[in-house]
Amino acid sequence: MKPTTIASLQKCKQDKKRFATITAYDYSFAKLFAEEGLNVMLVGDSLGMTVQGHDSTLPVTVADIAYHTAAVRRGAPNCLLLADLPFMAYATPEQAFENAATVMRAGANMVKIEGGEWLVETVQMLTERAVPVCGHLGLTPQSVNIFGGYKVQGRGDEASDQLLSDALALEAAGAQLLVLECVPVELAKRITEALAIPVIGIGAGNVTDGQILVMHDAFGITGGHIPKFAKNFLAETGDIRAAVRQYMAEVESGVYPGEEHSFH
């Protein structure tokens, strides 16, 4: 199988072809996703909640991310693999580079970091040293204590203009992908159209170039609160492989996410 690359996603944006991505944490699911053609995966610090049982992503370490990245890479050798740099792993550009090197050696193709214009120097340093960067704006879970909970971000003119400014700054610094989480559809559309790089949404409507879901949400195996933007594809199909195919098909056709999964 031909490897999926950042250039593959850039072509999807140029061709206006939506693409699906998903979180993965282990060999078996990564292998299954790849076999069904779902070839963009994220080893997210969401593993702190879904795998380790914490109530936030904050306890996750670089070693945790590297361990799961290596497992996913073994299951999906040709996927485009993103890996989160967890809380306090990129407080300075130098620290970011050291920790990015660790997860890249484990098998990641790209690192994802949360934050806006304050990360410009870090993004520049990483990209200059051959570490591709995916930005993450909107609801950034590592900032849950600042936000006072998991809340929609970017409502109102000032907040939306700031997120657009952040997105443009990250792109100018060298970021090659951007994740937008829990923002109004209207803002997601503005940002997606303003950027040349692909934008991946989660809780950002169907106007972004791609979508991502935490795999546990996509299969309905998350305990407790279910995010508004989540859809249980396994409940509709009764088969994990069929659920993966349906998720991909609904993203590519624009059926998912629907209005019921979106914010305004």
From Swiss-Prot:
Cytoplasm is among the record's keywords: yes
CDD domains reported in the protein's UniProt record: KPHMT-like
Pfam families: Pantoate_transf
GO cellular component assignments: cytoplasm
GO-annotated biological processes: pantothenate biosynthetic process
Subunit details: Homodecamer; pentamer of dimers.
NCBIfam families tied to this protein: panB (TIGR00222), PRK00311.1 (NF001452)
Name used for this protein in its record: 3-methyl-2-oxobutanoate hydroxymethyltransferase
Source species of the chain: Escherichia coli O127:H6 (strain E2348/69 / EPEC)
Gene: panB
